[in-house]
């Protein structure tokens, strides 16, 4: 994502959305980041209680009246929409493909790879033990899937949600960046 953004001369947003949410909500970014990492259980709880954003509120609540997990989503959604209005940019995750789905100028990309390839890349980058990284990847994918599916009512990684899906295991990262840049132009 960052490499494609640099090559295209676009702004890049990933963890920056945590800072934007923190500013909007009035919580320290560290708390938002920590809560974002633990969203799975909170989302499951909220879902079970019927309190996910927009599902059971009789009127549009104030941001401060929402559970913190929903405040984070709403604040990040606002940051994504505002950044997209300012100009071309690249977002990593946080349902940006769904949030911006009605805009005709959006290219929705999903980059994936087989588990073994992702595991090898992570070990090369982080140098941790395979079993630790494998479990971390499993938990991260689970959190992403639950987050995406709860806020979009769509399946995470489903081809219908994206304009371009690239297997970085087969293509390599540089080729994926090249194809994304070509698709944007």
Model-identified regions with their sequence ranges:
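Glycine-rich phosphate-binding P-loop
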Residues: 1-5
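Short glycine/serine/threonine/alanine-rich loop segments
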Residues: 6-10, 27, 128
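Short beta-strand-centered segment that lines the nucleotide-binding/catalytic pocket of NTP-utilizing
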Residues: 8-22
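Conserved beta-strand scaffold positions in the cores of enzyme catalytic domains, especially
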Residues: 12, 106-108, 163-165
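ATP-dependent small-molecule kinase phosphotransfer cores
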Residues: 22-88
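Small-molecule kinase domains that catalyze NTP-dependent phosphoryl transfer to phosphate-bearing small molecules
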Residues: 38-47, 52-53, 129-174
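ATP-dependent NMP and nucleoside kinases share a basic, alpha-helical "lid"
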Residues: 75-126
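Short, amphipathic alpha-helical "lid/cap" segments that border enzyme active or binding sites
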Residues: 77, 173-181
